[in-house]
Amino acid sequence: MSASDLTSVQAAAPQGSRQILVTSALPYANGQIHIGHLVEYIQTDIWVRTLRMHGHEVYYIGADDTHGTPIMLRAEKEGLTPKQLIDRVWTEHKRDFDSFGVSFDNFYTTDSEENRVLSENIYLALQEAGLIAEREIEQAYDPVKEMFLPDRFIKGECPKCHAKDQYGDSCEVCGSTYLPTELLNPYSVVSGATPVRKTSKHYFFRLSDPRCESFLREWVSGLAQPEATNKMREWLGDAGESKLADWDISRDAPYFGFEIPGAPGKYFYVWLDAPVGYYASFKNLCERNGIDFDAWIRPGSKAEQYHFIGKDILYFHTLFWPAMLEFSGHRTPTNVFAHGFLTVDGAKMSKSRGTFITAQSYIDTGLNPEWLRYYFAAKLNATMEDIDLNLDDFQARVNSDLVGKYVNIASRAAGFLIKRFDGRVQDSAMNHPLVAKLRDAIPQIAASYEAREYGRALRHTMELADEVNAYVDGAKPWDLAKDPANAVALHETCSVSLEAFRLLSLALKPVMPRVAVAVEAFFGIAPLAWADAAKPLSSAQPIKAYQHLMTRVDAKQIEALLAANRDSLQAEAAGAAAAGANAAKDAKSNAKASAKPAAVNGADDAPISIDDFAKIDLRIAKIVACQAVEGSDKLLQLTLDVGEEKTRNVFSGIKSAYQPEQLVGKLTVMVANLAPRKMKFGLSEGMVLAASATDEKAEPGLYILEPHSGAKPGMRVK
């Protein structure tokens, strides 16, 4: 660890006892938990366990997000009431979180009386503050179901490329975005009927109000992640600009949710009451355990409040949520921590490849949940970078790090200590230099966890495990045991090894809590906390017989996991086909013959040929210089090293997302064979690739592509 790294983790170390409220985003109650979800819950849980091990008062709160049109329609499709559906899904979600050791203090539901009261109170406070506006809007309406349709519940022909069965806001074939009114031959995915346009009164949170803008400009300065700060500033615009739009917080009946006070037939949009669900779940816990709820959520509270989320919902948690809290008389979040997305084997999760892996299928296949906790932790840091679950690397890393390095230490020493020394350690061995080194490292590892630098914490831990194994290899206890004259040396070697194993177990406890419980039972000690680094094993407490703590990952288990998830797709597709046939039959009298059943959720996009792809020359490029383009609000001028004799000049419309100095030295991907384009600012000799959401209005933001370390300028992407 470098001096700068050490300084940063020491700065993150806890100071005194703290009160801390932590949340993860609420899973939507219309589907299963999958491994993409688990990234966030495991990340949050590791952080929470780290804080608990310091002795802080920490509450980890969760709930199912249960309201909205999709819940209502799925329940109808399954012949259930919405309440029956969400109760069943809650049980499934709770089972999955328990399986993966996600230690919620309370896992609740947004469909609760606590949430209804809190949501109403927040709304009424915002109304009293003059931050609620009423407006007439025009929407698509299903004349058969007699309901207004969200954009994603309308399909039709893309107005740009004429692909069939595209959603009402974007085309999955050509990537175009458009208004639902621009769709050709539109139909309702609910009934198959042709939508009509109809006006309705809606309620808006006036996020554009100068008070909100002023507050958010100040609040953004406290965000821990530079990427989040940049996005916030992009959404806010420069001082004097008015880039914030008012937020539609209402939906029309029929709708599963909470009715708005004083507005019969109007309901809170799910994104209003969902974050309030954090407080509702906490209030439920407080009422059951005698905790002063108001002391935690009132302005000026000394308690801390943190939200772990995916970067795709940053907009809601860094704009709407803090503004709602500020102007309804509540404390605001201490910080929001966003993580990236999960890919599997370098690609988005795919049902057809079996990589859209559900939590339950992982458990049913017999894979150890702590393997996945460890692997995700090894990949996670404090940024919003995406992480990849490479299944070959998963097998290799778990087998090497956890079985080959960590567990191996105990298995090599415990038997000798039991047989030769009655299971009691040599007390003088607790002062061995190797033990002292591990003991001194524990605060650094704990601080890395608290700084959300889990990968760094585990690299440090495994480096120490390597040193312990080298010590055992050098001491050769199996040889020492052959001669009774070596009893003292053998006793010391085994004692040092097992105390080192205890300290490594302490370092790994936030990541692998169930292994830690087994280790605590093996040593006959109380649950490990960070302060226990200074409390070594004692000869007064003999160890128990060693039991195997972990097995290796078998490639056959991985194959079975992929096969199980491919099988689930086939079953789902068969069900969707049957449902589609029934829907077509029901819609025949209501809709045009062009109405189609919905496509299977998660199916892969239409493929292109290898010849099509080969026409594009994608190259790794290093940004050697970057500057803002005078006279342009959008462009940055990049000087790129593409492995050629000369650098290339490229203009890129990413100014809203990045400061020039952030990009210098980074690797990215460019289209190298794009025809040069003459612009008024100069010649652009290629195109830098960046990602953005399909609906950039709802989810603004740009993200340049960055290759893994090892890539070099000029390498071809293929």
From Swiss-Prot:
Might you give the EC number(s) for this enzyme?
6.1.1.10
Subcellular location, principal: cytoplasm
Q: What are the binding positions for Zn(2+) in this chain?
A: 158, 161, 171, 174
**Where in the chain are disulfide-linked cysteines found?**
none
Residues reported in the UniProt entry to bind ATP: 351
Q: Which Pfam families match?
A: tRNA-synt_1g (PF09334), tRNA_bind (PF01588)
UniProt-recorded Gene Ontology molecular function terms: ATP binding; metal ion binding; methionine-tRNA ligase activity; tRNA binding
Q: Which InterPro entries match?
A: aa-tRNA-synth_I_CS, Anticodon_Met, Met-tRNA-synth_bsu_C, Met-tRNA_ligase_1, Met-tRNA_synth, Methionyl/Leucyl_tRNA_Synth, MetRS_core, MetRS_Zn
Which GO cellular component terms, listed alphabetically, does the Swiss-Prot or TrEMBL entry include? Answer: cytosol
> Motif ('HIGH' region) spans which residues?
27-37
Sorted alphabetically, which PANTHER family does this protein's record hold?
METHIONINE--TRNA LIGASE, METHIONINE--TRNA LIGASE, CYTOPLASMIC
User: Which family is it part of?
Assistant: Belongs to the class-I aminoacyl-tRNA synthetase family. MetG type 1 subfamily.
Q: How does it assemble?
A: Homodimer.
Q: What's this protein's name?
A: Methionine--tRNA ligase
What organism does the record attribute this protein to? Burkholderia cenocepacia (strain HI2424)
Gene that this polypeptide is encoded by: metG
